[in-house]
From Swiss-Prot:
Compartment(s) where it occurs, according to its Swiss-Prot or TrEMBL record: Cytoplasm
UniProt keyword terms in alphabetical order: Cytoplasm, Pyridoxine biosynthesis, Transferase
Protein name in the entry: Pyridoxine 5'-phosphate synthase
GO cellular component terms, semicolon-separated: cytosol
Native source species: Chloroherpeton thalassium (strain ATCC 35110 / GB-78)
TM region positions: none
Active site: 42, 69, 190
Keyword Ribonucleoprotein set for record: no
First-listed, main subcellular location of the protein, grouped into a coarse class: cytoplasm
Keyword Transferase assigned: yes
Length: 236
């Protein structure tokens, strides 16, 4: 299982003082040199962490895979087409939320997703949908032309009861198996950390996990390189 590192909170720390450091581009390079298979950044509409200039520099420097998380808006689509990330992940976005709170409602937005994804594909940009691990969402992801699904692990990460954890892992397993059956590539993310990620390894259909906050928090104490290497060891 591979590791993609979300570097949003390097930018959060930088922006807390409106300074130039720490630099998310440097952090991304260190993550790659330490074995990360990809870099994830979320260009939010309010630009609360990653800025447009960060995205431009990341596109110019990332050597593995650049995954741009973004809301499904005209502005973001234009930015994606101009920047040409290796992957676009469509996520829900609310200005008042601290972090993404759930999967994209692909069922009610199905008719909007089809032309949106098609235009990105016409420019050579594959699309991933950040979704809840349900058969209905996976079916729609197939129908609208997504190449990937990112299964939302937020509920799993919050559970405490072993019985509930096992039930959620089974739900993730069933979703991943169905997605794979439909020809989708499967990744997972949200709320994963150094304590709960090992269990996700059991789901063989998940080829990569996207981890941000927990890894960046660890990096503030022990450095980016060691934080990345430690997570990779857990995934192997």
């Amino acid at each position: 299982m591979r590791l993609a590192v979300n570097i949003d909170h390097i930018a959060t720390l930088r922006n807390a003082r409106q300074e130039t450091q720490p630099d998310p581009v440097t952090a991304a390079r260190l993550a790659e040199l330490s074995g990360a298979s990809g870099i994830v950044c979320h260009l939010r509409e309010d630009r609360r962490h990653i800025k447009d200039r960060d995205l431009e520099l990341l596109r110019a420097t990332v050597q593995t895979k650049l995954d741009l998380e973004m809301a499904m808006t005209k502005e973001m689509k234009a930015i994606a087409i101009k920047t040409k990330p290796d992957l676009v992940t469509l996520v829900p976005e609310k200005r008042q939320e601290l972090t993404t709170e759930g999967g994209l409602d692909v069922i009610t937005r199905k008719d909007d997703l089809i032309p949106y994804i098609d235009e990105l594909q016409q420019h050579g940009i594959p699309t991933s949908l950040f979704i809840e691990p349900t058969p209905e969402a996976i079916t729609v992801a197939t129908e609208v032309g997504a190449a990937f699904v990112e299964l939302h692990t937020g509920k799993y990460s919050l559970l405490k009861s072993p019985k509930e954890i096992e039930a959620e892992l089974l739900r993730l397993q069933d979703a991943a198996s169905l997605a794979k059956k439909f020809g989708l590539r499967v990744v997972a993310g949200h709320g994963l950390n150094y304590e709960n990620t090992a269990e996700i390894k059991r789901i063989k259909e998940i080829e990569e996990v996207s981890i941000g906050h927990a890894l960046i928090a660890r990096a503030t104490l022990m450095g980016m390189s060691e934080a990345v290497k430690e997570m990779i060891r857990l995934l192997q």
